[in-house]
Amino acid sequence: MIDRFGRPLEDLRITLTHVCNFECFFCHMEGEEGDNYILSKEDILLVAKVAKNFGINSVKLTGGEPTLRRDLVEIVRGLKQLGYRDVSMTTNGFLLKDLAYKLKLAGLDRINVSLHAISRETFKKITGVDAFDRVIEGIKSAIDVGLVPVKLNFVVNRRNREEVFKFIELSQNLGVNEIHLIELHPVGLGKLAFKEHDDLREIEEYIEKISIKKQIRKKHFRPRYVLPSGLIVEVVKPYANPIFCAGCNRIRLSVDGKLKTCLYREDNVIDILDILKGEYSEDVKEELLGRAFMIAIAIREPNFKYKI
């Protein structure tokens, strides 16, 4: 499906829970401010089934921390049984060592691990948890079982800016495929922490100089730089960036049962909780959810636009 701004809808991002065992001071919470209502596995898979009918072929599981859901493996398995080409997950990595093999067997294709520091001290300052070594072990386990490409997310801010290039070195040593250097943006807790925002221009300019190739990713038109080691560094700058919004191909299912068309906005969401929890047959629910998706596509628009 194509929205009225010519953007294809290709990716479904599902928030499985708001609960997290870390306390990152900038967490954007997927742009959600509602209660931590947990949709059932059946609810999630029904929405995913309808989304698949609209041509969506990729699902990203997020949180909170998705590995805290006891039915995570079953959800992954169900998504693959629906025929999704790509099922991935973003995690803090705390429980990954124990879950990596089970998730791989269930059909998880790849994984993003949030690692916002390269030292135990900075890691604890950012997350509130002394778990740096445990997360590193989780990353190694993901690589070992074949959850590739393994990508690391690093939200750049004034507390960790000096660790960026050591983070690149660590990533190369770990053997990960790709890292994302992400701009802190004012969503969720990031609204309160935006004073820690740090401009990525100087960092990106240096990375471009040392790279051997530059690419532009279709999603969000993000710049990607291939280093001599083969590591890919992707720079993610969503804030006040109309180019980023012009390349958005996502729709989100919130933890409290809403179709969210934009990370930054709460004024154009479609509440589908009553459909999911209503006393309807599954066929009727599918029809009503299909209508909800049509409305969501119709009202979907970039948050940041070019001013002409």
From Swiss-Prot:
This is Probable GTP 3',8-cyclase. GO terms for biological process: Mo-molybdopterin cofactor biosynthetic process. Its EC number is 4.1.99.22. NCBIfam families: moaA_archaeal (TIGR02668), PRK00164.2-1 (NF001199). Keywords: 4Fe-4S, GTP-binding, Iron, Iron-sulfur, Lyase, Metal-binding, Molybdenum cofactor biosynthesis, Nucleotide-binding, S-adenosyl-L-methionine. S-adenosyl-L-methionine binds at residues 64, 114. It comes from Saccharolobus islandicus (strain M.14.25 / Kamchatka #1). Residues 4-224 form the Radical SAM core domain. [4Fe-4S] cluster 2 binds at residues 245, 248, 262. Binds 2 [4Fe-4S] clusters. Binds 1 [4Fe-4S] cluster coordinated with 3 cysteines and an exchangeable S-adenosyl-L-methionine and 1 [4Fe-4S] cluster coordinated with 3 cysteines and the GTP-derived substrate.
